[in-house]
């Protein structure tokens, strides 16, 4: 993931936000380390690439240009804006559904023909040839996926969900939603899943849906954007944030054919800000996805999609099965939840260590990333082909309606090397696609289909593969690997209960999968609805709710969710909803004192001063001050007035357009409107290197008043950091000004500026190491 850049970066913390000695606590440090200062240069892993991280501007910049544009908007323009939001939400659902269908078609056909070829050699008892075909095909598919991620789009590696979660929290993740990333994600997902790796396409589909939303919102790629006038309304971070939320919900819906589950996933897991209008649009996007998927299912059921049928869209329909359970079954159901919570937290802990180990390998260079992926693929292929030889052949049950044995790509009873009339239960689970393996485990009224020994082998194998496959340089999802592990242990528990319970083994498998997902991902409501829509059986609702609540509670007592752990490992500055208790013992004024002095500008500033500030600082916003001619109420005579806050990008725009004045004066409103259309200021343009200013221009002036946000959020210097963090996160700020409690003549009206990096727990602990030991320092 990280190459030589890591040697130049430093800091530490574990995934609970606790500081520690770098020598004795190296396993608990972020993969990308920050300098041991409060104002460190923000670096993080985006996908598998080290990137410079900035925050997004979710706050409305209320400068004079925005106010004028807002006042002059007609009803027709407002309707255009509303119509555009709903149209883009529809297009997000449409394209996500189409791409999900394409991925499923490709995976099912590629994997299907591969398994048919292997089965052909098995029937001829050419076992070595069958192994070579399986290994060769899987290595080739893995090579394609890995090379694309390593060489063309490192941000496409992994699930993408942690980066999306960070983006919706206010973190700008560079190159995360580009066209190249999306294409590599699509092709790489097809290759990795068709190669039989223990990966799912659910996480990548969430990322793909978000990429589609981002590209539609900005009118295309960075180099080929549509200059449509209507799209100017979407030229801001707030609307793009909402559209990407729709894209993430559409991705989950496309993965599980779960429209309500997709909306709830976006609400519960990825979105930081939510409101009713966004709820309606995300629901509309998922509804469009379902319509597209339903239409393609009808087409494919007629045999027009090659080997693709109902299988590719993960829909384990058990609506025709009537499950029965009684009060006495609550005890085994609770046991499933407890085991799921313990195993889920253990999986999170071990995966945390494996990702650190993989980081050491990936630091060595691109070739090592590809070799690691190929090694995992080789190990997986050998296990999938070789382990079924350890299982005993089982006789076919003549009372069942299904064909037994089968030699095709799917089916519940694979013959493998068994004689006629017998099947290999372990081959049924291993020599198939991951989707079909889940269907086989979820199958009902088949109490004797899988032996306990085969289930144990399958469970142990997929625990190992689930740990060592995630983290390689391919697109990957965590949903399906966890479902496979959970379904296996759930079915084993059902078989062990035997006649002591009335619950079907297939239902135990469903509950086991739900419990392990809740134990690892710590979601409840969205997972409950996803599993109900997945199985199409409302009878599962009561016991599914119990299992999810117990598993999440048990898991929370050990460690954070898997996505929170990955967020920390990547160094993404995600702000949690609940501040640390010790943050109430520190004021924002004390935090501001630990930073370098604040850099301010005058309302009418000299060009040379602006150039000097831009060259010598990396700040992205500067307070604009004015000498108060008429003292305001409560303002001391001769005190300086805070006019507002101006962004670095706007200063660069001023210099590039050379909007200079020969004399020091305030400009008229019409002068600014002629030079700066409001929608232009929404574009980020902070590259100052190519701006050439002459010596004569250096002596000119710039009136910053029209471009200044006159209503920035401010807090008193005696406010606690905990309270400031809650405000910063809930409002979606990029900068928060600290103002003094008492204004006096000659005193600067701004004590400091807080940014996202300043409010991160382990950054604060580097500057105030004794805070954690203070009263309330530990969470009880």
Curated annotation (Swiss-Prot):
Bilayer-spanning residue ranges: 87-107, 130-150, 177-197, 205-225, 247-267, 277-297, 327-347, 370-390, 452-472, 477-497, 509-529, 530-550, 735-755
Location (main, coarse): membrane
Cross-referenced Pfam families: CBS, Voltage_CLC
Cellular location(s): Membrane
Alphabetical list of Gene3D superfamilies matching this protein: CBS-domain, Clc chloride channel
Keywords: CBS domain, Chloride, Chloride channel, Ion channel, Ion transport, Membrane, Repeat, Transmembrane, Transmembrane helix, Transport, Voltage-gated channel
Membrane topology: Multi-pass membrane protein
Residue ranges constituting the CBS domain according to the UniProt record: 594-663, 708-770
Subunit text: Homodimer. Interacts with PP2A5.
Family: Belongs to the chloride channel (TC 2.A.49) family.
The protein's name: Chloride channel protein CLC-b
Organism: Arabidopsis thaliana (Mouse-ear cress)
Organism classification: Eukaryota, Viridiplantae, Streptophyta, Embryophyta, Tracheophyta
Name of the gene this protein is made from: CLC-B
């Amino acid at each position: 993931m990280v190459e030589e850049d890591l040697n130049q970066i430093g800091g530490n913390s574990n995934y609970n936000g606790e500081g520690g000695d770098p020598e004795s606590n190296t396993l608990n440090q972020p993969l990308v380390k920050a300098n041991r200062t409060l104002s460190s240069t923000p670096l993080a892993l985006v996908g598998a690439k080290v990137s410079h991280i900035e925050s997004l501007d979710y706050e409305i910049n209320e400068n004079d240009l925005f106010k004028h544009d807002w006042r002059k908007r007609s009803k027709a323009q407002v309707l255009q804006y509303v119509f555009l939001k709903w149209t883009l939400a529809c297009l997000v659902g449409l394209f996500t559904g189409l791409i999900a269908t394409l991925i499923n078609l490709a995976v099912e056909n590629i994997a299907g023909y591969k398994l048919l070829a292997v089965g052909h050699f098995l029937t001829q008892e050419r076992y070595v040839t069958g192994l070579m075909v399986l290994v060769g095909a899987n290595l080739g598919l893995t090579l394609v996926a890995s090379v694309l991620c390593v060489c063309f789009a490192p941000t496409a590696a992994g699930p993408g969900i942690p980066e999306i979660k960070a983006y919706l929290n206010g973190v700008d993740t560079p190159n995360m939603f580009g066209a190249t990333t999306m294409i590599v994600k699509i092709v790489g997902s097809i290759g990795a899943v068709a190669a039989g790796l223990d990966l799912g396409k659910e996480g990548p589909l969430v990322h793909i849906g978000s990429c589609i939303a981002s590209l539609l919102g900005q009118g295309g790629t960075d180099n080929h954007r549509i200059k449509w006038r209507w799209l100017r309304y979407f030229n801001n971070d707030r609307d793009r944030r909402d559209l990407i939320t729709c894209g993430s919900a559409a991705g989950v819906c496309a993965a599980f054919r779960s429209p309500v589950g997709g909306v709830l996933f976006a609400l519960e897991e990825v979105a930081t800000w939510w409101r009713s209008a966004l709820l309606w649009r995300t629901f509309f996007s998922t509804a469009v996805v379902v319509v597209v998927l339903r239409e393609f299912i009808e087409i494919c059921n007629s045999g027009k999609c090659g080997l693709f049928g109902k299988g590719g869209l993960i829909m384990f329909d058990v609506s025709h099965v009537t499950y029965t359970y009684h009060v006495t079954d609550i005890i085994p159901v609770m046991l499933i939840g407890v085991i799921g919570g313990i195993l889920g937290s253990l999986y999170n802990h071990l995966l945390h260590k494996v990702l650190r180990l993989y980081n050491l390998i990936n630091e060595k260079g691109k070739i090592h990333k590809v070799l690691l992926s190929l090694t995992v693929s080789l190990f997986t292929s050998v296990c999938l082909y070789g382990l079924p030889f350890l299982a005993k052949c089982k006789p076919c049950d003549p009372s069942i309606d299904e064909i037994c044995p089968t030699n095709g790509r799917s089916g519940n009873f694979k013959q493998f090397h068994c004689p006629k009339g017998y099947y290999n239960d372990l081959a049924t689970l291993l020599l198939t696609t991951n989707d079909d393996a889940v269907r086989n485990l979820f199958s009902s009224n088949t109490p004797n289909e899988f032996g306990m020994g085969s289930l144990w082998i399958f469970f142990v194998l997929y625990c190992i593969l689930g740990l060592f496959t995630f983290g390689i340089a391919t697109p990957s999802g965590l949903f399906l690997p966890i479902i496979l592990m959970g379904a296996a242990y759930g079915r084993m528990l059902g078989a062990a209960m035997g006649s002591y319970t009335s619950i079907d083994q297939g239902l135990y498998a469903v509950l086991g999968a739900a419990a392990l997902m809740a134990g690892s991902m710590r979601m409840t409501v969205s997972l409950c609805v996803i599993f109900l829509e997945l199985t199409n059986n409302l009878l599962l609702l009561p016991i599914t709710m119990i299992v999810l609540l117990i598993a999440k509670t048990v898991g929370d007592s050990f460690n954070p969710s898997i996505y929170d752990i990955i967020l920390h490992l990547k160094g993404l500055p995600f702000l949690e909803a609940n501040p640390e208790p010790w943050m109430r013992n520190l004021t924002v004024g004390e935090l501001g004192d630990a930073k370098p002095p604040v850099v301010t500008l005058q309302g009418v500033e000299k060009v040379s001063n602006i150039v000097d500030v831009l060259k010598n600082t990396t700040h992205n916003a500067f307070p604009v001050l004015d000498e108060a001619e008429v003292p305001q109420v409560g303002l001391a005579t001769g005190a300086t007035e805070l006019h507002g806050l101006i962004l670095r990008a706007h200063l660069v725009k001023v210099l590039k357009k050379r909007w200079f004045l020969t004399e020091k004066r305030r400009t008229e409103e019409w002068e600014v409107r002629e030079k700066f259309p409001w929608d232009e200021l929404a574009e980020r343009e902070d590259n100052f290197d190519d701006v050439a200013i002459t010596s004569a221009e250096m002596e000119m002036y710039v009136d910053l008043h029209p471009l200044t946000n006159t209503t920035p959020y401010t807090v008193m210097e005696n406010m606690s950091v905990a309270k400031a963090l809650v405000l910063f996160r809930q409002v979606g700020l990029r900068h928060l000004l600290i103002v003094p409690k008492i204004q006096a003549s000659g005193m600067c009206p701004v004590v400091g500026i807080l940014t996202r990096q300043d409010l991160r727990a382990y950054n604060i602990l580097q500057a105030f190491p004794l805070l954690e030991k203070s009263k309330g320092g530990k969470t009880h």
